[in-house]
Design a protein with these regions (language model features):
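A generic transmembrane alpha-helix motif of multi-pass inner-membrane proteins
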Residues: 167, 367-433
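Membrane-interface loop-to-helix entry segments
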Residues: 136-164, 340-352, 371-380
Length: 433
């Protein structure tokens, strides 16, 4: 029997797994640039940064694991996608980024020790060892994250968000050019990509499925019902938080001059509101957010590679990813963010279309035809976006892509992918006849 308390704990765990430090960093900057359009921009951000990951989480939880999304692709394509997915959200990009965000926003502002490469390494080692201790006992993940870490994190965030609405630092600023010249909703939609939460949901769905299985809940209908119930808790909390952080950014003109990222806005804002105590408050928020996400992401990656390799156990991969994360994090946050974006532009649209295809799969007359054609088209367009980001796309290709709807909004792949999906459905029906 899954009680209301169990649903609450699971919902809090889902909230904590999705709420990484990066999710706290991005909204303030977007709110600052959106200015008077902050609410509309926040709505767009919530659609891609909260609602879409929630839908993905439910789908994957019912399937049992993220790998089921790719079962209709050729084996080589399935392995390539999943390996890329877990590398992006794992020890190559996201996990080292989490470590660096925790160091730069939770440790350095306290001025306990000097900001040196040696101290960075010491922090990275200690921080990742703490996370590893949680992961080596996977049965404690739902209880430790859902019962202890999340409530503490939530209390700290409530203190900040309530204070922001009661005592904003500045009047709401005018929108920047990027928000003034285009739809704030669309710009917010694209900004929501930065959370990488659709990718994370593919990994986290397996964690939720295992948590429910531990309670003897294995029937698809029950899994869906409890995942939706628990997930709604996460959706409400994340949406409320993002709207609050967008408002924080929109009213941050007093402290936002000369900043380069939302983390600096958040840090300065909190310090002005709460003084020296604000540094400790912010450090607590960032540290807990980073730790909970690191535990969830690394655990999901370790489970996947343990299944893929068969002979090497989960604990081995936890140690491997912990060591890799510690080493790669020494490259610094700025460099990691630069190399993450091209990979994200390539894989994110593919992940979205795999979820969309799952909804229509039962009605497809020729499953493999639709899957292969749709994903192939999506990859072609997303690859162009990735190459364009690193300056390797030719002017001719840019001009060609400019003819497609939503190109200026970074969504040139969407219409062709959907068109091919529906076209292959019609072709499949004719073949069946």
């Amino acid at each position: 029997m899954f009680s209301r308390k169990d649903i609450l704990v699971l919902g809090m765990m889902i909230f904590a797994l999705f709420l990484g430090a990066g999710n706290i960093i991005f909204p303030p900057m977007e709110g600052y640039t959106a200015g008077q359009h902050w609410a509309t921009a926040a709505l767009g951000f919530v659609l891609t940064g909260v609602l879409m990951p929630f839908i993905t989480l439910v789908v994957v939880s019912v399937l049992g694991r993220g790998e089921e999304l790719t079962r209709d692709l050729p084996k080589w394509a399935e392995v390539l996608f999943l390996a890329t997915l877990y590398l992006v959200i794992g020890s190559t990009f996201a996990m080292p980024r989490i470590t660096n965000v925790a160091y730069e926003m939770a440790f350095v502002p306290l001025d306990i020790v000097a900001d040196t490469s040696r101290n960075h390494l010491i922090f990275a080692v200690v921080f990742n060892i703490i996370a590893m201790l949680f992961m080596l006992k996977p049965n404690t993940i739902i209880s430790s994250v859902g019962k202890f870490m999340t409530p503490a994190l939530l209390v700290l965030l409530v203190v900040v968000t309530v204070t922001v609405f009661i005592s904003p630092l500045s009047d709401i600023v005018a929108p920047s050019k990027s928000y003034a010249d285009s739809s704030a909703l669309t710009t917010g939609l694209i900004s929501g990509y930065q959370t990488m939460d659709v990718l994370a949901a593919i990994a986290f769905g397996g964690i939720v499925a295992r948590a429910l299985s531990a309670k003897n809940i294995t029937e698809p209908q029950k899994i869906m019902r409890y995942t939706i119930s628990a997930g709604c808790i996460s959706v409400v909390l994340l949406a409320a938080l993002y709207f609050s952080l967008f408002y924080l950014g929109a009213t941050s003109d007093q402290v936002a001059q000369g900043v380069s990222n939302g983390g600096q806005i958040f840090s300065r804002y909190v310090n002005v509101l709460f003084g020296k105590e604000g540094s400790w408050l912010m450090s607590g928020i960032i540290f807990l957010a980073s730790l909970t996400t690191l535990v969830g992401v690394t655990s999901a990656c370790a489970y996947y590679f343990a299944k893929f390799s068969n002979r090497l156990p989960y604990s081995f991969w936890v140690v491997v990813f912990t060591v890799m994360t510690t080493i790669i994090s020494e490259n610094g946050l700025t460099k990691l963010l630069q190399v993450t974006i091209p990979a994200l532009l390539l894989i994110y649209p593919v992940a979205i279309m795999l979820v969309v295809l799952q909804f229509v799969r039962a009605k497809l007359p020729c499953v493999k035809l639709t899957y292969n054609a749709t994903i192939a088209v999506t990859v072609c367009f997303s690859l162009c976006d990735s190459l364009n980001n690193v300056g390797l796309l030719s002017d001719g290709m840019k001009q060609f892509l400019g003819n497609f709807p939503l190109y200026d909004n970074g969504l040139a792949w969407l219409v062709p992918a959907l068109a091919v999906m529906f076209l292959t459905m019609l072709v499949g029906k004719k073949r069946a006849v």
